[in-house]
Amino acid sequence: MKNREYQQIDPQALATPTPTPPPRSLPEHKPRRARRKWEVFPGKNRFYCDGRIIVARQSGVLPLTLGLILLTSGLFFIFDCPFLVKHLTSCIPAIGGVLFVFVIISLLQTSFTDPGILPRATPEEAADIEKQIDNPTGSSSSYRPPPRTKEVVINQQVVKLKYCFTCKIFRPPRTSHCSLCDNCVERFDHHCPWVGNCVGKRNYRFFYTFIVSLSFLTAFIFGCVTTHLALRSQGGNGLVNALQSSPASALELVVCFFSVWSILGLSGFHTYLVAANLTTNEDIKGSWSGKSGNEDVGNPYSYNSMIKNCCSVLCGPMPPSLIDRRGFVPSDDSVQTSPVEIELPAAKNDINMVGRAVTSGRPPPPPPPPLVVTLQQPAISMQNHSTA
């Protein structure tokens, strides 16, 4: 039998096994929900339908406008149209229905459309603009920073671009900052509380369609109600009996009488602005009409033709929205995965032994000798192998 030598293992040389604690469960990293830009929009606006609808925060008058239109039109279709169809023609409710649809659609488009809000400057862009404006050295006490305006030439007319301290941008031509919505609006006309939104470059055509169609609808209802009461008062009945037989017509008559004049006047005023290619803001300030004292100043945006101005304001292509309110906000947390370090039990035992020695004041014991198992086989000579 072949001889084999074994080296005995000292049991004291073996380190006492230390129970390994169960691995800690790392907290699950829940990914954040991607937020859209309308959720962090800095302006004073309200968004609905996941950012598809935008209105001003102070839009409490809009339900009143919509309610008056629905109430007056509903009373007209219920109480006046049946009598007029019976005694005059069936075209009256058809004409009234077309005007009513135009009014409602144009009102909703004016109220729920982005008027032309300009996005605010990013911190990097704002810092770059501030460097261009302020004194780069600041050493000279007599140095005066340049005014926060820029001058551009449009059709041989100098136009000043003012710096907006809120949006941190130089406003483009015909742009103004609305204090109610807290936004810079391109081709700003005015803030209309009746529609609950600013009127600017992107929704002015809807606003003009709304006031013109509303003036036609109001005048149409006023004329039809007057005709209805006149027909009822014939035959010796009198106006009092006619009002008593149709009290809803009296309410319509009062509402239309007090509103038709203001609506017709507003439609005529904006027709003049469209023909001259002006805005309400420019007309009030007298920027190009000589009211500001500059009599020789002409409107650089006018095409010198009423037809061209009307086509430019009302029939041009619809500009896209610049705020991208349904886009996603870029994630700020750049989480990088790092390699996981795993402690081996042997290394942990060494650390525990050193820690116990330090606390007791004794030098740490030497590490245990490595566990060596030596398996020695006797060398078998060729002679033995051959004789075997």
Curated annotation (Swiss-Prot):
Key words of the record: Acyltransferase, Golgi apparatus, Lipoprotein, Membrane, Palmitate, Phosphoprotein, Transferase, Transmembrane, Transmembrane helix
Keyword Transmembrane helix: yes
Organism lineage string: Eukaryota, Metazoa, Chordata, Craniata, Vertebrata
Bilayer topology: Multi-pass membrane protein
Acyltransferase keyword on record: yes
Gene Ontology CC annotation, any one: Golgi apparatus
Pfam families: DHHC
GO molecular function: protein-cysteine S-palmitoyltransferase activity
Compartmental location: Golgi apparatus membrane
Region described as Disordered: 1-33
Name this protein carries in UniProt: Palmitoyltransferase ZDHHC18-B
Lumenal topological intervals: 80-87, 227-253
Residue positions of the active site: C192
TM region positions: 59-79, 88-108, 206-226, 254-274
EC number(s) recorded for this UniProt protein: 2.3.1.225
Family statement drawn from the similarity comment of this UniProt entry: Belongs to the DHHC palmitoyltransferase family. ERF2/ZDHHC9 subfamily.
GO BP, sorted A to Z: negative regulation of innate immune response; protein targeting to membrane
Residues annotated as domain DHHC: 162-212
Comment field on protein domains: The DHHC domain is required for palmitoyltransferase activity.
Reaction catalysed by this enzyme: L-cysteinyl-[protein] + hexadecanoyl-CoA = S-hexadecanoyl-L-cysteinyl-[protein] + CoA
Chain ranges on the Cytoplasmic side, renumbered to this chain: 1-58, 109-205, 275-388
Functional description taken from the UniProt entry: Palmitoyltransferase that catalyzes the addition of palmitate onto various protein substrates, such as CGAS, HRAS and LCK.
